[in-house]
């Protein structure tokens, strides 16, 4: 490991919570370089341009085995010390089991679950005492949600995976935290909340004001 190079990796960094995490980690100066990961390279470049910390736009689809392999190869070649991993990549879509396509369901599971696990396993060998893993789950992790059944199940997976991982990391000084927000002011919230499914979710989770 090259201890002189501290890297923070943020997935989903092109928008929403991922972009905000990039801004906050930049402000806190927790790394020598930020790796901003998402599919939209132009959006990543725009985010990187807002930051003072040197930032790298890593255009990658986290459901692609080839793209995950490329990230692993870059980590192996550069051997940095990963101080933060923020897994904010993910998506949700309202609809019941009849209206959401099989492809959308599979993509949701692949990104929200497998992509998150793959990134965590890729980064862990480069972490040491003081490093942090932050997994973006959701308040949906705590209750079955009609019209978001698969999404809620994926976030429950993230919560339980992170809790178990935290126990496995006991004594290493590496921490793993699952973030479980309700509504957050993002592009997804603007579209989803006014929908019929959004009203059902609000009834179950509570109609909090988006933060």
Where are these regions (language model features)?
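Active-site helix of classical SDR
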Residues: 120, 154
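SDR active-site lid
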Residues: 166-211
């Amino acid at each position: 490991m090259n201890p002189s190079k501290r890297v923070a990796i943020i997935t989903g960094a092109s928008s929403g919570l991922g972009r905000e995490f990039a801004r906050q980690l930049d402000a806190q100066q927790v790394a020598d370089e930020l790796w901003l990961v998402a599919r939209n390279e132009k959006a990543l470049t725009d985010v990187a341009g807002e930051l003072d910390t040197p930032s790298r736009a890593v255009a990658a689809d986290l459901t692609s085995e080839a793209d995950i392999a490329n990230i692993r190869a870059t980590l192996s070649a550069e051997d940095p010390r990963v101080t933060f991993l923020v897994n904010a990549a993910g998506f949700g879509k309202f609809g019941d089991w009849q209206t959401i396509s099989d492809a959308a369901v599979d993509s949701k599971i692949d990104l929200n679950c497998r992509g998150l696990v793959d990134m965590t396993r890729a980064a862990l060998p480069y972490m040491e005492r003081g490093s942090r893993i932050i997994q973006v789950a959701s308040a949906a992790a705590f209750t079955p949600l009609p019209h978001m059944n698969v999404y809620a199940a994926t976030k429950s997976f993230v919560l339980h995976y992170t809790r178990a991982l935290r126990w496995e990391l006991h004594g290493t000084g590496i921490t793993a935290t699952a973030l479980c927000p309700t509504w957050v002011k993002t592009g997804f919230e603007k579209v989803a909340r006014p929908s019929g499914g959004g009203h059902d979710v609000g009834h179950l989770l509570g109609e909090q004001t988006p933060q």
